[in-house]
Design a protein with these regions (language model features):
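Alpha-helical scaffold domains
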Residues: 1-235
Length: 235
C-alpha cells in the first residue's frame, strides 16, 4: 500500500539503515529503509488502533517489498490477533514470506497465553514444516512460553527432533537449550549428560557456549558446561 510505504520512508533514518543492513546481511540493502524498532512499533500501535481494517488489508497483500513492511506486518499480528486461532491463521499466511531472523524474532503474540495447550500443538506443526523461519518461529515460541511454569521435559526432545541444516534454525535451537540449562537445570543438565549426545555436535556445543555466556549461572556451572563440550566429533 503506497501510503504505508511512504509513511515508512518518512520514518527512516539513513544512518540507521547501514547498521540494520549489517544485522541482516542476507537482505538486499536497497530493501531496508532504516526505521528504528521503537519508531516502527509506535507506528504499528497507532495504525492498529486507528485503522484496523486497513491494517488487515495490508497484511493480506503479500509479499511485501521492504524489510520494514515485513516488520510492520509482524508487529500487527501481535496487536490485532483476538485469539490464538486468529493468530495461527495470520502466521500461517505470513511466516513462509519471512526471510530473516530479525523479522521472525520480533513477533510477539500475547493471546498465545490464553490457550497454551492449543499453542503447543501449533508449535509442533511449525517445527516440522518446510519454511525455514516458520521452524525458527516455533522454536522461539517454545523458548518464550514453555521454559517456566509450562515446561515439560518432553519439550527438550521436541527440539532435538528437528533435523535441519539451516544456520538460523540451529541457532534458535541452541538459544532454546541455553535457556533450558539456565531455567530448568534439573532436567536440562541430565539431558546434556546423555551418551551418546542427544544433539548434533554444533548445536550441542553452541548451546553450552551460550549458557556459559549468561550472568545467571555460577562460575562452577560455567566450568562444568565447558567440561561437557565435545572437542571433536562428526556432525
Amino acid at each position: 500500500m503506497k501510503t504505508i510505504e511512504q509513511d515508512l520512508k518518512n520514518l527512516a533514518d539513513p544512518d540507521y539503515q547501514a547498521f540494520q543492513s549489517n544485522l541482516v546481511p542476507n537482505i538486499d540493502a536497497n530493501l531496508i529503509l532504516g526505521v528504528r524498532a521503537p519508531v516502527l512499533r509506535k507506528y504499528a500501535k497507532g495504525f492498529a488502533k486507528t485503522h484496523p481494517h486497513e491494517a488487515r488489508t495490508f497484511m493480506q497483500q503479500l509479499p511485501h517489498t521492504y524489510y520494514e513492511e515485513n516488520n510492520l506486518h509482524g508487529e500487527l499480528i501481535g496487536l490485532l490477533a483476538k485469539s490464538p486461532e486468529d493468530a495461527f491463521t495470520m502466521l500461517d499466511s505470513f511466516l513462509p514470506y519471512v526471510n530473516n531472523w530479525a523479522t521472525c524474532d520480533l513477533i510477539r503474540v500475547k493471546v498465545f497465553k490464553k490457550d497454551l495447550s492449543t499453542t503447543l500443538n501449533k508449535i509442533k506443526e511449525w517445527i516440522v514444516s518446510d519454511p525455514e523461519y516458520m521452524v525458527r518461529f516455533g522454536v522461539v515460541q517454545l523458548m518464550t512460553l514453555f521454559l517456566d511454569e509450562a515446561f515439560e521435559p518432553e519439550h527438550l526432545n521436541l527440539v532435538a527432533s528437528i533435523k535441519r541444516e539451516e544456520y538460523y534454525i540451529n541457532m534458535a535451537r541452541a538459544w532454546y537449550y541455553s535457556y533450558a540449562l539456565i531455567k530448568q537445570p534439573e532436567t536440562a543438565i541430565p539431558f546434556f549428560e546423555q551418551q551418546p549426545i542427544p544433539l548434533d555436535t554444533w548445536t550441542y556445543n553452541k548451546s553450552l557456549q551460550k549458557a556459559r555466556e549468561s550472568r545467571r549461572i555460577s562460575p562452577e556451572q560455567k566450568a562444568y558446561f565447558q567440561s561437557l563440550k565435545i572437542k571433536q566429533a562428526a556432525r
